[in-house]
Design a protein with these regions (language model features):
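Terminal alpha-helical anchor/extension segments at protein ends
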Residues: 1-142
Length: 142
């Protein structure tokens, strides 16, 4: 049986599913879930105040930079996990579902060999959707 994993992720959370198939039916089984709480911090938690002055633009740039950094950290963590899983032979095919920015970050953090296992990359944020909605985006051939 070919093991296909589906990774549904965004900048602060991810879920990993395995495709379960029988003769007439395909379903998803959730294997793991991840959260990156630092990425989910609110603006006020990051800067400690609600200043309204000429520094707002600089503050916004700083917060955007922080968000980019945290998104990259989470992509590295998830990429490392997937690289290890591939080394252990836990999947044979990998389907990625993520918003474009995080999808790019994640692909950069997958090893060359792990990237070879990616059979589909879908640039949609489905991490908060139910299993049926996620499954509807998986091509039937997987």
């Amino acid at each position: 049986m070919s093991k296909t994993w589906v990774v549904v992720a965004e900048s602060s959370r991810a879920k990993i599913f395995q495709v379960e198939k029988n003769e007439s039916h395909q379903s998803l089984k959730e294997l793991e879930g991840f959260t990156h709480s630092t990425s989910r911090s609110h603006k006020n938690q990051l800067n400690g105040s609600q200043q309204k002055d000429s520094r707002d633009s600089q503050l916004t740039d700083s917060l955007d930079s922080h968000k980019d950094h945290e998104r990259g950290e989470f992509a590295r963590t998830l990429g490392h996990h997937l690289n290890n899983a591939r080394n252990k032979g836990l999947f044979k095919k990998l389907i990625l579902m993520s918003p474009p920015k995080f999808l790019g970050d994640l692909r950069k953090n997958l090893g060359h060999e792990t990237n070879k296992f990616v059979v589909s990359a879908i640039d949609k944020n489905l991490v908060r959707h139910n299993i049926q909605e996620i499954q509807a985006h998986i091509p039937a051939r997987y």
